[in-house]
Amino acid sequence: MRLTPFLTLTLCVASLGMAYADIAPSALETLVIQEGGRKKPYLVFAEESLRSLSGKTSVPLDGGRRDAMTIITGIWMDHSASWKEKELILVSNRPLKNHLGLDPARKLFSWNELSSNEVLPKEMAAAAETRRRDPRAKLAGLQKEASDVGMRMGMLESLVSGDSYRVIPPIAGTDWLPVNRSRDTSLLDPLQVAWAICDQHGFNRSASDLLSLQKGLSPQPPAWKIALETTYQKARPFRWAWILYAAAGIVLLLSQSSWERRGYQVAWVLAGSGFLLQAAGLLSRVLIAGRPPVTNMYESVIWVAFGTILFALIFETIYRAGTFLLGAIPVAVASLILADSQPMILDRSIHPLTPVLRDNFWLTTHVLSITLSYAAFALALGVAHVALGRIIAGHRPSDTLYTYLYKTLQVGILLLATGTILGGVWANYSWGRFWDWDPKETWALIALLGYLFLLHGRISGMWGGFGLAIGAVLAFLSVLMAWYGVNFVLGAGLHSYGFGTGGFPLVATYVGCELIFVTVALLRRNNLRA
């Protein structure tokens, strides 16, 4: 009978890859871990790690779907080479899979499968050599895709070795230590044993002991900040916001034909609730990061969605038209769905600021002004779609609708002009010159001049309301270039802190659809006039 605990432990350790199915690691959610230049809750670390590895926060594994906490904790508790046999590493690029001889229908592969591939190491070595010759070189094509896969393989190695789990504050210096390299390696033993024998109570008790020990050491981030980030990560406020916006849009559409007044009120409540949820999410990011939430593409997308609804609600408060909400909701919903569903393109992680951005005054004034102008132009885009949609449906939009569009464009131009001037002042302060024809500066100026020309044409009588609506749709393409194109397509200039990759097929599809929409509206308008 004395052999029973030993046999249980041995059998569980031997099949540790399956043990994660029987124990919940939620007791570790608020454990503080240092990663990516900052200290964050373990829950955030787990979800970000699996998202970087696999593209999602849950993946199919061993006959079931496992979430990030389960997988990342399982790797930590086990830290054995068996995890290199699991299909956890994302390879999404079809040309690369064809080049490597991998099954193009699969997206996830094991570390062992990739490391034994004869072609992948050569592509990774070529990418490394390109970077060695020129550290600023921009990888492209198969080299870039292979380099990304190599980074994921390196991340899994670091997780399996235990080096990624930096939860012990140092006595001196800035880097935290993994438990397996701390002076007291017994800290992890009770957790591992409880995990191995599937002892939920013992695991929770050991996790609580580790949390208590960590809180007694320093330096530690404020407990409220860790609790806030954990709540923010679990609440998914932006997801619930777009769901409420979508519901408001549906109610607003249905109320066009019946129960108009009551439907408008319901839509207002739903949109307002979504707005408050989104505001809470943005405020949480501000408190967690200690800065405005506009330092990368993900944050700017959710901020522009927020600004679009904000301007719509302000205009609706004044005019009670329904048009502004009807134009804003599709833009906000599409933006938030994009931010929620494309984590490999729009990185939602909170990162430390690059040196040039470490000035909250200029970050707040310049960047918020520019991005709020994008929001106003996005609202104008939505209102223009409402007007052109009526034409396509065989109705003539009222002059009032075109007046709403004109006022929205005025707000956008004011904000873009202000933001561009403030950007020049900041550039002079940071880089010693007001203007240098940097791609970001150039396209901001092109967008500003394009919208000014659009309003000038309306004032001077070169075109009427219909031309204004067509122009609002086409001019937004210049905003898209300044916002997305410079950062993700050109990838050049001094604004490198906003650079990224991916999403080009989505953007190209959007541009194509807009051109088709404008063409149909033009043809339909000619038919109506005839």
Named regions from a protein language model:
Residues A19-T231:
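Soluble extramembrane regions of membrane proteins in the secretory/endomembrane system
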Residues R261-L276, G322-V331, T400-I413, G464-A475, ...:
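Membrane-interfacial loop-to-transmembrane alpha-helix junctions, especially the N-terminal start
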Residues S273-A279, W303-T308, A332, L409-T418, ...:
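Hydrophobic membrane-spanning alpha-helices of multi-pass integral membrane proteins
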Residues D22, L213-A235, A280-V301, M344-L368, ...:
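Membrane-interface interhelical loops and short amphipathic "cap" helices
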Residues L338-V367, L372, L388-G389, M462, ...:
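Extended, aromatic/histidine-rich regions of cofactor-dependent oxidoreductases associated
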Residues Y245-G249, I302-E316, L368-A387, A444-R458, ...:
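Hydrophobic cores of alpha-helical transmembrane segments in multi-pass inner/ER membrane proteins
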Residues F6-S15:
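Bacterial N-terminal signal peptides
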Residues Q220-V333, A339-Q342, S349-P352:
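Core alpha-helical transmembrane segments of integral membrane proteins
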